[in-house]
Structures are given as structure tokens and as C-alpha cells.
Amino acid sequence: MPNPVRHGNKKDSGGSASTMPESSGSVNNKDRQRISSKHKRHKSKHLRESSVPEPQTLSTLKLVEYDDISSDSDTFSDVPAKQERRENDERRPSEKSDKMHKSRHRHQHKRLKEATRTKQVEKERKPEKTQEVMVNKVPSSKDKIISSAKRTADEQEEHGRTSKSSSKDSRSKMHKDKSRREREMKSGHKERSKSHRKRDSSKRYKTSDSPKRKGRSPRRKYGGSPKQDDSHSEGSCGQDYDDSPSRVHASGNFNETYRKNMDSPSYKEPAAYQSSARSPSPYSRKQRSVSPYRRRSSSYERGSGSYSGRSPSPYVRRRSSSPFVSRRSLSRSPAPRKSAKSRSRSPLYPRKSSSSSRSKKQKSQSRSRHSSISPARLPLNSSLGAELSRKKKEIAAAAAAAGRESKGSPLILKKESGDSRVASALDLKKATKVLKLEKPVSEPEMVTATSSETKTISAKKEESEKKPQVQAKDPKISGLKDCKPAAIKEEVLTPKEGVTDRDKDVPPLPPILSPPPPLPTSPPSNIPPLPPLPPSPAVLQQPPPPLPPPPTLTFLPLPTTVAASLTSSHYVRQSSLSTQANSQLPVPSPAKPQPPLIHMVPHMKTSTLPPLPLPPLLLGEDDIESPKEIPPPKSVKKEKDKDRPRHLLTDLPLPPELPGGDPSPPDSPERKVVAPPQPPLKKRPKICCPRYGERKQTETDWGKRCVDKFDIIGIIGEGTYGQVYKAKDKDTGELVALKKVRLDNEKEGFPITAIREIKILRQLIHKSVVNMKEIVTDKQDALDFKKDKGAFYLVFEYMDHDLMGLLESGLVQFSEDHIKSFMKQLMEGLEYCHKKNFLHRDIKCSNILLNNSGQIKLADFGLARLYSSEESRPYTNKVITLWYRPPELLLGEERYTPAIDVWSCGCILGELFTKKPIFQANQELAQLELISRLCGSPCPAVWPDVIKLPYFNTMKPKKQYRRRLREEFSFVPTPALDLLDHMLTLDPSKRCTAEQTLQSDFLKDVDVCKMATPDLPHWQDCHELWSKKRRRQRQSGIVLEEPPAIKAPRKESVSVPGGDAMKNSSPAPTQPVKTESSVSDLAVLGDITQQLNQSELAVLLNLLQSQTDLSVSQISQLLNVQANPDMQLQLEALNQSITALTGAAVPPQEVEPPKETPTLDQVDPLGAGTQGEVQNVLAVLLSQLLKPQEVVDAPGESNGEQSGSNPTAHITLEEEEEPDKHHEQNEEEEEDAGNYWSP
């Protein structure tokens, strides 16, 4: 087993066997001194404050002896390890977190080892056991005998202590026998706690680098001398405990160093620890208890929030496990530890410790124990050591004789306690004198005083506790194991986790850890469990001694009330209290009187003063949880404890009430937890409600619909990550724009620009910002994306045109009112974006969309980003299309503002008046040159900060220009010119904002609703893609250039309703006048159109694009019109008029009726005769148009325009011709981008 080996290591380090106690001790002392020397440098100040360095040698020797004992106890603990392991396995889940914390507190492991060793030794040698228990600090029975002989000589000098101590020793022996029996009875619980401790300690030891640390760990943890507290212990241990269990884990190494420091003489333990080393046999026991005390501290810490691994607090786990026996064993519950301590060490000590924690005397004793513990390591004075040895010898003799005698009589115990008090006072005086002689340090003196007090008190308590504790322990054991109510009481005790341990060992820790008197307040929160556990031992101890009863009475009531209140409050404070306890555990080294170590300092001071130390012990215990109400509650608690100890044993069911109280707090938190979750659940839907509302508008959830829900009409644009299609929702008939997001070329998954656009558009809801309706995919199943990367489509409301397409088409002329309306809407949308802290960063004419009603919307937020006006941070300056890029970006500015968007809008304003971009360059330097020519050269005179820009010197214009903007735009109305001048200011800090533009004379009085709707080409959707294709066709010399020229006049003569009618699928009203066609033509066309529906017209339009010429007979055949002379004349007239208009000799002919599939065959040959490839494409398109028409009479859409399903729709020749030409253009565009169309 790893534990046995480690125990062996410990033994070796500590003086492996009792046979070699002193020599091993000396070696260990040397090692410790070496280790301490490392820390001495850093902690010299703390050493000065906390304790005298000289006594360290003595204390180290004693420590070595103690280590030997602990190693023996470790061997004992190995025997019950299996059972303990079983129990531990059950408790492992809770122990795991504790183990993390336990790594710090190896002293607990010592307890386990000592307990196990004591069991084995008890089996092997009961007499030796009694001797060893009497002399807990002595490494072996031989060492103990030798030390006892020396101590007897010293003790003879001391006043009646020897007789009292001898009686106490005999009693302690008797009590030890009883405690052994009790241990056997409680062995199950102890073994659990031991095994738990064992594993924890073993794990701790594993974490520790050396066995020496293991043996010393208990002392080291607490012994981390005040020096260590200030520097190392505070920093490491205090932080570890205070911070959290996580810290405890993280500081495993820290704990090791901390332990090393404690071992080293430089790390003198607080005076309390030191004094205990020299204290008589009871002190030696106390020292053992001290090590358990350290274990307590660890267990306490474990129990406390920092050891939340087992449970956020001892209360929680104990609550959870009504059998606190297991909890005790797991969490080092005070009762099992008491029994273990009493067994391995004299039961008097545990009793003393518990009684000391419960009574003022006990408090002082526990503090003195701490001091005595530290003296054990740090020999404050040879005189103190002699006194301690004397006391130990006297106590041993007295315990052997008087222990047996006094077991039966509480009066004797009381007397002994009174005598012990007197002796303690004398001892304190002596110790303080010796300390003063050795060193003037007030802390050591206090420690020695406290140690002497603890010695006398411990002796008294041992005597008083012998019978009551044995009896009480047995009932506790039986009650804890057998009775759940008893378990509940112990649970209350156990919640303190080692209340017994603390009383026995922890009381010393509290003095160091909990000097602050505020502990009483903290006890209410955390102590509630602690008082109950000590009360049981204290009850045993306290009832016998009449002297302590008054303080015990006062103390007991508090523990019960405090236990109740603390149990309830402890749950709330568990984590914080545990952290406090943990911090206090490191604070144990607070022998220093540093204010941060207030807890330690008060303890030291209180330990020097017998009455004061008593409250501090309770405070110490309480301090671990909270150091607020220390002194007054302690006395009350002592009295209550004295009364209740018996009552606690009998009133075990009452503690269950405390646990009940504890559960109630958890219940309340649970209720709270339940309540908060519900509100969040309610809140989350509220947050989502608006989005769900938007989705409800489309009656679909984003991403769940497939793109096949839309009929794709055509391609209208190309974006950075895909094409933009015009489509119609099959369910609603609504036109939409599908922006394709292709994933096949994306190495990083979804394009960041698309993600940005989606994220921003969902936050921007404005009438002047394009609305994204939903997102659809082209895969029905998400798994399809793995096989073949699919695509997403952003579904936007459809806008008929964009500003670039309209301006380049030449089909529209904007009046000043139109420009006002456009700019008003544009700047409203931009102001909205800027108020939302978004920069568009890509404003250009092609990203400004219009519909046929003249409504403007800002689109394409792929480059937009959130910006913070409060913090200036750099952004990329490679944004905004070059023609619309402001001068600051051209000069390398990275900390730009929304003014960049205003410049782009200024460029658009000038473009609306000039019908072309005002700055058209293909390079940044050329662009800056054009800007300089119009707006003046950037110079510090007009733009002070321009010299700070990165490219100011490298991109200076060749020539300095003056501002000529007003001259160049003199034709612009003055209000518009003023606005343009302001928007195109070089200095961005002087440039107007979007809000200011709306307040300008040009826009402030504009009412968009009252503005006249611009005459837009309803027959043609003017988008950037279409405009670019037209431009290429013009450059290539294709004749299709003419249709726009023809359309422009038509647009003027044709009323908007006609185009709208076609797009809205409503019958188009006949046009009364047409400039380029005769009335006779209109009449002829009217007659023909009456026989056609829109679907037929669509087929005809497609057909006409492949035909350069159609004879009347062909038209009559295609349209199934009887070739009577009148009709032939009409068709000829129509053909001639169209030929004249288009110059392409392509008469717009009506479409064949969809019912005639043969027309497809006829069309194909016709087309084949004229244009080979084009005709093939058109034939395919025609076939696709006719197939759906055959299925459904509803007409298809021509040129992306909705065609009405009304078969009797009447369309005038103009409408026919416009769609024809529009269709021709679209078809040619489709030829260029034929692959975009999916057959």
C-alpha cells in the first residue's frame, strides 16, 4: 500500500522507531532546520514577531518525537485501512474534493496514521499505549519514559501540579483504556475517518515531496510560523484556504513548501504551538491533538467551503448523509477524531480540547495548546521544556493514579480542574517569564502562557472528561452509529467537522486562526455544527469540572443557539466560512501579531490572558467560520456546553432539529435557485420574442425551409460570396431576393462577411434598411452538407432596382424632389445605423436599392461592423469601394469614425446630380488626386490632423489644388450644394454627421410620403448586373444597345401603372398614346392581344429573341390565328412597326398558347435556321416556360416580372413591346450567364 510505505518513510524521517527516538529526532531537527533556513531569509521578520528562534531546537526535537508517534499511529491506521477504505469508497465522491484540499493538510493524515498505530499498539502493547498517549509528543515509549523522567524532575519543582497531574495521568491511563474500548466501539467510525484521512493524507503525502513533510505535515500546516503566515502561509495557505478548493488544489506545492517552512526552525510555529511542545504529558497529548488539530484544520477546512469537494460545508454533507458517523469519518467529524485522539493520545486531551473549546478555561487551554504545540517545535526555553516535562510526568503519575480514582467522582475532576487552573496560572507565569528571559517577543510569551494554561486546563479537562467522555463517547458512538438523532446531534457537531478535533486539536488552531473576537458572530453562521461536536466531549468533560461550568453554561447555550443559527447561516456562509477557516488555517502561523492576522494575534493575546484565551478558542473554532462574536458567546457557550454536553448526549434528537434548521436553509436556497431559474426562463423567451415575432411573419423558422420553396426567376446580381437571384415564394407569391452563400470555396466554413451581415441585419430594423426575412438552405437534410457542400440563401425583400442600375440605364431622369427624397431616406437609414453604432463601410450606388414606388433601402452589410465611439481602436482602411472612399482612408487612417459613411453619401449626392460617379479612379493615388482637384489638396491648413496619417507624406498630390467643389457643382441648387460641400469636407472631424445632414436646408423639410414617385422603368429591373452586361454589350457593338434608347422614350410616354400591372400580375390597361407607334398599329395590336394571355406573351417573347424575322404566316401558325386578310394585314403592320422601332426587324409577336406543345417543335426549327447556339438556349427556356404553363394556366413571369394568371388579360402593344425588349435583353444576359439558370 502506498500509505504504509509512506508511513514507513515518515517513521524513518521522524525517528523511524521508538527505539531511535532522539537520534531520529535530532536528524529530523537538522533537516527541519535546513528546510527552515531556506524560509528564514524570507520570513526573518515573521520569526522575530512570531516566536523565538532559539527554542526551535527543542521544539524540533519534540516534533521529531511527535513525528515518531504519528508514524506509529500511521502503522496502526494501516490495520483498519481496509474497512476504512470501504467506507471511504462510499465517501470518495465527497472526499475527492477534500483530497485536493487534504493535500495541504497532511496533519490529518498523521491523525489517521496515529489512530491506526494506536490501534495496533493497543493490540500489541496496551501499557505502552497508555505511556505513549500520556506522552503524545514523545516519539516512542522509551523516549516518552526518558522524557517523563526528566519531566518528573522538572515537575517536582512545580507546585501541586505533580500530584494533580499524577492523578490525572492515572486517570488518563484509565481513560485511555476506556478510550481504547470506545475506539473499538467507534472503530467503524474512526476507521472511516482514518481511512478517509489515510487516503487523504496518503494523497497529500503523494503530493508532498518527502516523507519528512508527511510526518511534519500537521504541524507544518499550522506551524507555518507566523512568519510563514505573513509571507508564505498567508500568501499560500491563507490564499489557498480563502480562495477556494481550486486554490487548495493549485497550492499543493505551496502546501508542501508551507509544511517545509513549518518544519524548519525558522518557521517557528505560533507561540501557542511552541508552548505545547514543552507542556507536560497532557501537552504532549495536546501536541498530538495539535497534529490532529492541524488535521482538524484540514478537516475543518475540508468541511468548510474550501473543502467543498466533500461538501460545500460539513453541514451540507452531513445533512445529505443523516448518518453523520460516515460524515464524521469522511469529514473528520469531531466525535471519531476524539475517540481516535483519546485512544492514541490520552483521552483527556481530546476531552480537554473539547472542553477547552467549550469553556473559557478550555478556550485558554486550547490556545495554550496551540502555544504548547508551537513550543514543541520551538523550544522557547529550557525552563519551559523542563516545566513541560515536569507537568507531563506529574500528569502521567496523577493520570495513572488520580485518573482511575477521579473517573468516578466529578467533584474530584472539578477540583483537579480548579487545581489545574491554578497550576496553569503558575505555568503561564513561569512560561511567560521563561519566554521573556529567552526572548522578549510578546508572542512567544503569550504562547508559553497559553501553553501552560492549556496544560493545566487540559489536565483538568482530562480528569473531568475521563469518565464523562468515556461514557459520553460510548453513547455518542452508539448514538451516532445506532441512533440517527444522535447522528444528527453529531451532525451538528460534525458540521463543525472536528469540533471535537478542534476542541482537541483545533482549539489550538482557532487561537492562532481565530484571534478576532468577532468569532461569536461567525460561530452563529459556521460554528453551529462545531459547538455541537465539542459539546459532546465538552459535556463529558465539562459536567465533571464544577469550575468551568459557569463559562461552560454560557458557552453551551450559544453553541446550541449558535449551532442552530449557524447551521442555518452556515449553509449560506459555508463557502465563505470555509474559506475563512482555510485562511485561518494558514493563519495558524499567525504567531505574528500582524493586523491581517488579527485572528492569530487576538488568540495569542487571549492565550496569554487566561480569561481572554478561553473566548479565543471558541473564537478560533468560530473564526474558522467567522471571527465576529468571539468572547461573549464563548462564555455562554461554555455554560451551555457544560449543561448540554450531557443534554447533547441525551438530546441527540435536538441536534436533529439543528440539522432540520440546516436543511431549511438549503431548502430556502433551493427555492431561491428554483425561483431564479424560472425568471430566467421567462426572460429568455422574452428576449427571443421579438425574433420569433419576425419569424412568425414568415411563418417559418430560419434555416428550416429549403430553397425549393421558391421559384427562381433569374439572376440579378453577384456578391462577394455568391449570386443574388430574383425569386417568388411558392406559398405567398411574394417576390424575394435570394442572396446565395456558397460554402464550397470556404476554407473556414461560413463566410465571415455573411455571418457579419446576418448578425447586423437582425439588429437593424428600419424602413430605410433592407429587411432580411429568413435564411433557407438548398439541402433538406443537414447531413447532405457533409456529402456535398450546400449553400445557404439569405432571403430579402425584393427591390426592383438599385441606384447604379438606374443611373447607368439612362432610362430615368431624377428631379430635385426625387433626389431630396432619395437622400432623405438614405441619410435616415444611415443615421439609424450610426446610432446603433454600426459602420456600413461599403456605401455605394449599387448598395442603395429602390423599388418602383420610390422607396430607398440601404443594403449589403457584409463589410459593416460595430464600432465604439468611446474607445478609439484601429480598423482596416481597405474598406469602401474606391470611388466612394474618403481621403482619410486613402491616407491610411485606421481610427476612423462614421464620417467615412457620410463622405460616401456625399459622393452619391453628387452622382445623383451628375448621373455619373464624381471620383472615378482605378488606383488609390489617382483617387486621392481626383479628390484633391475637386475638394482641394489635404493640408494642415484645412485638415490639421492630416500630418498624423501614415501615408500623408507618401501620397501627397503632385500639385497643390485649391477647393473647386462649388465651381464644379454650380448647377446644383444652393441648399444641395451647401450640403454637398459639407459632406465632402476633407477633415472628417469637420465633416457633417448623418444627423446634421437631415437638419440641413436641403433635407430638413422633405416629406418622403408627399414626394412624387419617380418614373421608374417598371418593365425592366435595373440592377448592377444588368447594367454591367449592357455596358459590355455596348462595348462589343451588339445592337441590343438600342432597346434602352427606345425604352427611355417609351418610359416617358408609358404610364407607370402599365408596368406595375404586369409586375403585379394584373391586366394592363391599354395605353392611349404611343409616340413611336401609330394609332392603327395600336388598334391592330389591341385586336391581337385580346386573343392572347400573358403566358402566351411570355412564350412569344422568348421565341422572338431567337428570331430575326417572323412572317405573318409563321405568326399566325404560332398563335393559331386564322390567316384572314384582315389579320394578316394587322400582323404585317405590327411586324413593320416593331422592325422600325427596334431596328432589329424583330416584331414582337404574341406567345403561342401554352396548350400547344407542337409550337415548341416549330419554334426550334425556326430558331435553328437563324441563330444556332442562341436558339438552343432559347428553345430550352421556351420548353421550360411551356411545361409549367401546360400544367398550370397561370402565366409565368417574363424577364423576372410577374405575369398574371388571368388568361383574358389585355395588354397593349407598348406593354408587349416593352416586355419583348426587356425579355430580349434578359435572354441575352442569360446567354452570358446561361450557367446561372438551372434548366
UniProtKB/Swiss-Prot annotation:
Coiled-coil ranges (or none): none
Pfam families found in the cross-reference section: Pkinase
Tree of life domain: Eukaryota
PROSITE patterns: PROTEIN_KINASE_ATP, PROTEIN_KINASE_DOM, PROTEIN_KINASE_ST
EC number, UniProt record: 2.7.11.22, 2.7.11.23
Biased composition (Pro residues): 507-552, 587-596, 653-667
Active site: D842 (proton acceptor)
Main location (coarse class): nucleus
Biased segments, Low complexity type: 300-337, 345-357
UniProt-listed Gene3D superfamilies: Phosphorylase Kinase, domain 1, Transferase(Phosphotransferase) domain 1
Domain Protein kinase: 710-1003
Biological process annotations from GO: mRNA processing; positive regulation of transcription by RNA polymerase II; regulation of MAP kinase activity; RNA splicing
GO molecular function, one term: ATP binding
Binding site for ATP: 716-724, 739, 797-802, 1023
A GO cellular component entry from the record: nuclear speck
Family annotation (CDD domains): STKc_CDK12 (cd07864)
Record-given protein name: Cyclin-dependent kinase 12
Organism: Xenopus tropicalis (Western clawed frog)
